[in-house]
Amino acid sequence: MEGHVKRPMNAFMVWSRGERHKLAQQNPSMQNTEISKQLGCRWKSLTEAEKRPFFQEAQRLKTLHREKYPNYKYQPHRRAKVSQRSGILQPRVASTKLYNLLQWDRNPHAITYRQDWSRAAHLYSKNQQSFYLQPVDIPTGHPQQQQQQQFHNHHQQKQQFHDHHQQQQQQQFHDHHQQKQQFHDHQQQQQQFHDHHHHQQQQQFHDHQQQQQQLHNHHHQQQQQFHDYPQQQQQFHDHPQQKQQFHDRPQQQQQFHDHHQQQQQFHDHHHQQQQQQFHDQQLTYLLTADITGEHTPYQEHLSKALWLAVS
């Protein structure tokens, strides 16, 4: 039909272009219908990895087709009129009739044989007297034989549809299993992240407590030295040889006082840094760890710890 825009090839048609030619060369006497069955069985036996390049090529052809024909809509051809005298298809619609007989699914992954029907129409145009729909095994004899052949063709189409539906079910089950495995892996990664972050928080809190204890012990030692100073004064009065040390004591007191102030400033600054780091880490965890948005008991525990540290 002139002016008719062909549908883009699906993955099976892309794959079968070369395979059909090879199979026809290896088996010159094999009929078109048998070749199509063999190709369908081989296509089903391919793995998803082996099919993926052909699906990608089919998607590319579909994109080019959409760009070339932006207003294209699929319109099935009208069924061909069969001559009452001979049962011969008219030349102009021969390929359309053959195509519609086995075009049982519009799914892009379904098996279609459009190229075969175009080839059959070409053969018919070369020899109109001998073309009797042999590629699809449509008999032109007794009506009972025609009904039997139609029932056989319908049964084949039903079997193909069942096989295709079963393949889709298996693929959906495989995809669901993969998604379930990915979700399980994600849950494990999230749990590992929680455990690692919790361990880091505990270690940092323990280190902070140790630093606080060391600072407290040092401050206590300084206070003890300050309380011992009156006793040292009494020893000075009892021992004249320590007179020079007594004169230097006010300067030492000032140094001790300055040192005590520096220690206090260091303690305050270090404590403020620890609180800020703890607060920043807690905010980072609350924003990134729990992607589901739920408030976990562990987050409540960290929030209470943060409040105690700040207060």
Curated annotation (Swiss-Prot):
Gene3D superfamilies found in the cross-reference section: High mobility group box domain
According to its UniProt record, where is this protein located?
Nucleus speckle; Cytoplasm; Nucleus
* UniProt GO molecular function: calmodulin binding; DNA-binding transcription activator activity, RNA polymerase II-specific; RNA polymerase II cis-regulatory region sequence-specific DNA binding
- PROSITE patterns xref list: HMG_BOX_2
Write down any Gene Ontology CC term.
Answer: nuclear speck
* Record-annotated disulphide pairs: none
Q: Name one process (GO BP) from the record.
A: cell differentiation
Task: Write out the entry's keywords from A to Z.
Answer: Acetylation, Activator, Calmodulin-binding, Cytoplasm, Differentiation, DNA-binding, Nucleus, Repeat, Sexual differentiation, Transcription, Transcription regulation
User: Posttranslational modification, per the record?
Assistant: Acetylation of Lys-81 contributes to its nuclear localization and enhances its interaction with KPNB1. Deacetylated by HDAC3.
Tell me one Pfam family matched here: HMG_box
Q: Give the DNA-binding residues.
A: 5-73
Where is the stretch described as Disordered?
A: 135-279
Establish whether keyword Transcription is in the entry: yes
**Compositional bias per record (Basic and acidic residues), positions renumbered to this chain:** 173-187, 236-261
Protein function: Transcriptional regulator that controls a genetic switch in male development. It is necessary and sufficient for initiating male sex determination by directing the development of supporting cell precursors (pre-Sertoli cells) as Sertoli rather than granulosa cells. Involved in different aspects of gene regulation including promoter activation or repression. Binds to the DNA consensus sequence 5'-[AT]AACAA[AT]-3'. SRY HMG box recognizes DNA by partial intercalation in the minor groove and promotes DNA bending. Also involved in pre-mRNA splicing.
Q: What's the subunit arrangement here?
A: Interacts with CALM, EP300, HDAC3, KPNB1, ZNF208 isoform KRAB-O, PARP1, SLC9A3R2 and WT1. The interaction with EP300 modulates its DNA-binding activity. The interaction with KPNB1 is sensitive to dissociation by Ran in the GTP-bound form. Interaction with PARP1 impaired its DNA-binding activity.
Q: Supply the domain comment.
A: The Gln- and His-rich domain may mediate protein-protein interactions.
> What name appears for this protein in its UniProt entry?
Sex-determining region Y protein
